[in-house]
Amino acid sequence: MMISIFSLLASTAILVFANGQSNVKLEFVQAMWRHGERASQVDQYPIYEKDWIYGGGGLGELTAIGMGEMNELGWLIRKRYVTKLKFLTPKYASREVYFRSTNFNRTIISAQSLLYGLFPPSLYDVKNVDYPYSPLTWFPGFTFVPVHVDGPDQCAASQNCPCTRYDLLQGQMLTLPEVLPKYTQVVLLNRRVGGYYNMTSGLDSFTTYPDTWKCQRAYFNRTMYAKLPWYNEELYYQAQVTYAPVKGFLEGNFENPAVTSSGLDVGLEIKKVRSGVIINEVFNRANEKLNCAELGQNCTSYLNKLKFYGYSIHDNNVYGVLVALGIPQIANTLDGWPAYAAGIFMEFHRNTSTNERFFKVLYREGDDTPISDVTSQLPICNGATLCPLGALQTLAETLKPLPDITTLCKTPL
């Protein structure tokens, strides 16, 4: 009898849980990803701009491999949100999706490559409705999807707006016990490598080689070994791991409390000017969308039918958001910053019965990896796999640049 009672209670609990979960509906997705593999951004012996012929040629340009990486990511997004969840329609619908990019060829073409995977030519596309029927001059089923490019005053994604305060904060970082030893290691390595290149000045600030080597070795590894007798895998590895903690500091990631002797919380202040804008933008847009979903047909906002909002950005941008969310370690790379084609997916859910609001965070590490749920790893979620939206709201309020990013960036410490 006792066993029967426990069985009944367990069955009831499972039924209640299932019913509760069935009322939770995915309403909105906001995603941000790093562009695909690119050429080096600078000339560095023995490889120069003329050697970078890939993807149209030039320094910093997306390569064909990078296009393929982004196309694969587009297919993964389609698999999840079109095929599995039936959340997006199978073909491009202008009111359902919106895509932004920073004003760089590599991020723009990355977005286009991703969209070619998300909305590939298919039987869902109707000739003379979705594309012109011109068999000899137009690939059947191919449709364009717009990518909106950020202007110079849009700091949410690019983090490239001038910020004097950020420059001052970097100076304050050097007063922290955690930081100075790591910076010293970087400077010593810079001097060593600069000597190999026969540099006579600017050695301390010679910081481009770790990233440049990463690009060069992918396409010109034999040339590097032939022309650089001192170069080897051990030195490459040393450069990546030596720079990793410093790259973390630049986005506000510290292992210890980053408070100066005067009481300035350097870590918090860096996050405000680096990731605060995009975190607040994402939260505010999600909150407005969920308000709209609650209103149903009475909602007149442009968000009424919008389901997916995407940012095509850079490694430091994606990393800044990981730092803000408290999960920088999931980047899982030698240099600490996200790999090519890595991405964050923030899903926003609503209980249609109670109007309770939740969010989930998913992450894709890079090429040839799946999109995985990492919600329970967020410190603000306390192990929950469906995190209350209030946790994200509190984070956004904590990191909000006040009164606005432009004014804050001009404000002295």
From Swiss-Prot:
Active-site residues (renumbered): 35 (nucleophile), 315 (proton donor)
Q: What keywords sit in the KW lines?
A: Disulfide bond, Hydrolase
> What's the top EC group for this one?
hydrolase
Per the UniProt record, the source organism is: Caenorhabditis elegans
The name of this protein is Putative acid phosphatase 11
Catalytic activity, as annotated: a phosphate monoester + H2O = an alcohol + phosphate
Cysteine pairs bridged by disulfides in the record: 381-387
PROSITE patterns, alphabetically? HIS_ACID_PHOSPHAT_1 (PS00616), HIS_ACID_PHOSPHAT_2 (PS00778)
Q: Which family does it belong to?
A: Belongs to the histidine acid phosphatase family.
